[in-house]
Design a protein with these regions (language model features):
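Acidic, small-polar-rich N-terminal luminal/periplasmic segments of exported/outer-membrane proteins
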Residues: 33-169, 577
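Outer-membrane beta-barrel translocator/receptor signature
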Residues: 112-113, 125, 134-137, 143, ...
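Solvent-exposed loop segments that connect transmembrane elements
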Residues: 213-221, 258-308, 352-362, 403-455, ...
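Outer-membrane beta-barrel domain signature, strongest for Gram-negative TonB-dependent receptors
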Residues: 219, 225-388, 395-397, 589-591
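Structural signature of Gram-negative outer-membrane beta-barrels, strongest in the C-terminal barrel
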Residues: 235-239, 378, 390-394, 456-597, ...
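Membrane-embedded beta-barrel scaffold of Gram-negative outer-membrane proteins
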Residues: 325-329, 335-351, 532, 538-544, ...
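Gram-negative outer-membrane beta-barrel transporters
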Residues: 386, 475-479, 591, 596-598, ...
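C-terminal beta-signal and adjacent terminal beta-strands/loops
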Residues: 411, 598, 645, 710-720, ...
Length: 787
């Protein structure tokens, strides 16, 4: 461990001990000063977060920090958790929990292994899931498999978001934010009472900015924001036993995409080729687009503070959603709950896939998605048994068109297809070509502009039944058992034509369609023991199983790839041992846990050369088993009435078992070798966050000074651990200072104050590489008022 790390850890330890000692003194002076208790629904019923025997970080008061703009700003508050925005998708998220992350975040044909739930509704698409912080009551981050109660696609964990309920009293909260790059944000929530039995809440948000990375090719900026949302929530309480909570909302996000910004290819001689060895593709000699368009090559290997796209990254995601939650208390011991959710999402986007100033590859995507879910649940509480049992139904469907244009196809096939008789042969699809040419085009176009057209639609239906019970064996020992049965069916239809006219949805007369269907079922169990050491501390141990859906991947190069890319479910088995305690008169909250997660049939995606078409394609398979082992610490400290702090730390050791693949995709030879020496993606060995708030009385109000430092260790983003695709170790510092008085406040905030920027490079092996940089230092001011 480096000297810097030793000093850092020593400082943290000393700070902790000092805080505890100070707490002993201050506790006598202010015995009522305690850490806020947060009530969560991590086990489908209300409990104190400290009583839940799982690794959970619950946030409520922290959400008031002006440095938390959306859920991506939560990174650093929970160990082994990284939440980022998906720059290639409007409002998309990229979440890592304990090294588990979605192998693909840009397409609806793949389900994330981490669930985002909003008011009890599972979001089945990443588009629009980058949730705004305003009007949230709390966020619960559940780490590790949650298959028994939350079901499929939770092998990594769950981000559980709960918004505020109508108060039934007239009042309002308004907020305005102004920042760099023309940032203007306006938010409002109004509560009122419509009658003695109906309370209502109305909410609206508007976010706009001019973007933050200049595009030197076509002008303007990438990352421009234009987001509006509004809706209403109604609470109906006709009597003491029944309530119905209905939310109707719409969101319109016209923000531009942030990725990709640059082509990583550099002119020959600018950087040396990589050393000999597998999986180190040479991007230094002008591969493909750099060789064809030398003016678009980077002249420096250094990170560039601008974008070079020849296409404006326009995007749109429009969402309409309805959520209904009804609850009926049958008696003092039994409660029946019904939750229904429906979402319609329309998503469009266009982006420069080669990331350069050349008109080489431009991708356009149109997607319509809808989902409906129903859940009915019975919760019971008797003398020594508490249980939850329910039925769940989920259905989603998407339809997608995709067009890849630019000069790429002309460069690849133009010389052959422009020869006499060859266009007609390609149209006939008689075996001389691996692709078919558009029969509606009479001849090879003079400008050489061709399009690859893809179509895919998929319907998913799943049903589940579950039950979990806590049995108090003694006054201190609790036995937890749970089981969930799931059945899921997917029906996928896809077609693809390489060389076509740019006419999306115009008949879709493909030479071949893939019509694929499969059904899977799974039974997952949970067994756990919890022992109360005293009223304020517990130890627990649990064994939990999880299930991640199988399926078909739509982003491929031809219909044969669609058939080839059928992948099976992956399964997880997790052991967790933990300790939770409130110490020093509830001034210190200390949670620690060890975990061991075994994954079977782990799903992975790689970008390889298609041997039939000589272009790149996405290949999916269940590559191997994988093991994730680590330790987590999560602490909060109330030093005194003026200062509170938090600290979290996570370690992770991730390894493959039985991974066999072609470890050198660039040599043109398929050679399968043992690859257990590679590191699974998105698994930093170490991460931590530390921060605090100092409250200083000032006049009639209070000045709050907040700061947070977080560090994420380096991790692999490429399946074959390419040096080019390795994300570096990153530090992040956020801070704010604000004045709060009665019902108003003014806060100045700064994010990424050290201005640490890095480039994440995506190798499209063996053709080229594209890069995206993160946003640098930025400042803003937030004005808030309540009445």
């Amino acid at each position: 461990m480096s000297i810097y790390k030793n000093l850092t850890m020593s400082f943290i330890a000393l700070s902790f001990l000092f805080s505890v000692n100070q707490g002993e003194v201050s506790a006598q002076e202010t015995p009522s000063l305690q850490i806020e208790e947060i009530i969560v629904t991590a086990q489908k019923r209300e409990q104190s977060a400290q009583d839940v025997p799982i690794a959970i970080t619950a946030m409520s008061e922290e959400l008031l920090s002006s440095t938390i703009r959306d859920i991506s700003d939560i990174t650093g508050y929970a160990p082994n958790v990284v939440i980022g925005s998906e720059g290639r998708r409007p409002g998309g998220t990229d979440i890592q929990i304990r090294g588990i992350s979605a192998a693909a975040t840009t397409d609806n044909s793949y389900d994330s292994p981490i669930a985002i739930n909003v008011d009890g509704i599972y979001l089945g698409t990443s588009a629009g899931s980058l949730l705004d912080n305003f009007d949230m009551e709390r966020i619960e981050i559940l780490r590790g498999p949650q298959g028994t109660l939350f079901g499929k696609n939770t092998v990594g964990g769950v981000v559980n978001v709960i918004r505020t309920r109508p108060t039934g009293e007239f009042g309002a909260k308004v907020q305005a934010t102004f920042g760099e790059d023309g940032r203007q944000e306006f938010r409002a929530v109004v509560n009122t009472s419509l009658s003695e039995t109906v309370a209502a809440k109305f909410f609206a948000t508007s976010v706009q900015s001019d973007g933050w990375i200049p595009n030197i090719t076509i002008g303007g900026n990438n990352g421009e924001e234009d987001y509006q949302a509004f809706g209403a929530t109604f609470l109906f309480t006709p009597n003491k036993r029944f309530e119905a909570l209905l939310t109707i909302e719409t969101m319109d996000d016209q923000s531009a995409l942030q990725a990709y910004n640059q082509n990583f290819n550099v002119a020959p001689g600018v950087i040396p080729p990589p050393p000999p060895g597998p999986n180190q593709t040479d991007f230094s000699g002008g591969l493909l687009s750099c060789a064809i368009y030398p003016d678009s090559c980077r002249t420096s290997p250094n990170q560039l503070p601008y974008a070079e796209n020849d296409t404006q990254h326009d995007a749109s995601v429009e969402t309409d959603a309805i959520t209904l939650n009804m609850k009926y208390d049958i008696n003092d011991s039994l409660t029946l709950t019904y939750i229904m959710g429906h979402r319609d999402v329309k998503e469009d986007r266009i982006y420069d896939y080669d990331g350069s100033s050349a008109p080489f590859i431009t991708i356009e995507r149109w997607n319509e998605y809808d989902q409906t879910s129903h859940e009915i649940r019975l919760d019971g509480s008797y003398d020594n048994v508490k249980f939850t049992a329910g039925l769940y139904m989920f259905e989603k469907e998407f339809e997608q068109d995709w067009a890849t244009g630019g000069t790429f196809w002309g460069v690849l096939f133009g010389a052959a297809l422009s020869a006499p008789g060859q266009w007609e042969a390609c149209q006939a699809f008689d075996g001389r070509y691996s692709v078919q040419c558009d029969v509606t085009i009479p001849a090879y176009p003079e400008n050489g502009t061709l399009y690859q057209i893809l179509y895919a639609t998929q319907k998913t239906e799943s049903i589940a039944a579950y039950a979990q019970a806590d049995w108090s064996v003694t006054d201190r020992l609790i036995l937890t058992t749970g089981v969930r049965w799931t059945e899921e069916e997917k029906h996928f239809i896809g077609g693809q034509a390489y060389l076509a006219a740019h006419d999306i949805g115009g008949g879709r007369n493909f030479a071949d369609y893939a019509d694929l269907q499969n059904k899977w079922d799974n039974t997952s169990v949970k067994v756990g023991l919890t022992y109360d050491l005293n009223n304020d501390s517990i130890v627990y141990a649990s064994y939990t199983e999880g299930f991640h859906s199988g399926g078909y991947y739509a982003v491929v190069q031809n219909t044969s790839n669609m058939r080839q890319n059928a992948y099976d479910p992956e399964f997880s088995e997790s052991i967790e041992i933990g300790y939770k305690a409130l110490l020093m008169n509830k001034r210190v909250q200390l949670n620690m846990n060890y975990f061991l997660n075994d994954f079977m049939n782990k799903q992975e995606e790689s970008t390889q050369q298609d041997p039939t078409t000589k272009t790149v394609a996405s290949f999916w398979s269940n590559v191997a088993n994988a093991e994730y082992e680590g330790f987590e610490l999560d602490a909060q400290i109330l030093v005194n009435q003026y200062f509170r702090m938090f600290f979290n730390y996570g370690t992770l050791d991730a390894t493959y078992e039985g991974f066999v693949t072609d470890i050198d995709e660039s040599d043109g030879v398929i050679k399968l070798e043992n690859a257990d020496f590679l590191t699974p993606r998105f698994a930093p060995e170490e991460s931590y966050g530390i921060g605090g708030t100092l409250s200083i009385p000032a006049g009639q109000g209070t000045v709050d000074v907040f700061a947070k430092f977080s560090r994420i260790g380096e991790f692999e983003t490429n399946l074959l651990n390419s040096d080019l695709g390795r994300a570096p170790e990153t530090d992040n510092v956020n801070a704010s200072i604000g004045y709060y008085q009665d019902n108003w406040s003014i806060v100045a905030y700064g994010q990424n104050l050290t201005d640490e920027q890095y480039e994440v490079v995506d190798p499209i092996m063996p053709l080229f590489a594209i890069g995206t940089i993160n946003q640098g230092r930025r400042f803003g001011v937030v004005l808030s008022a309540e009445f």
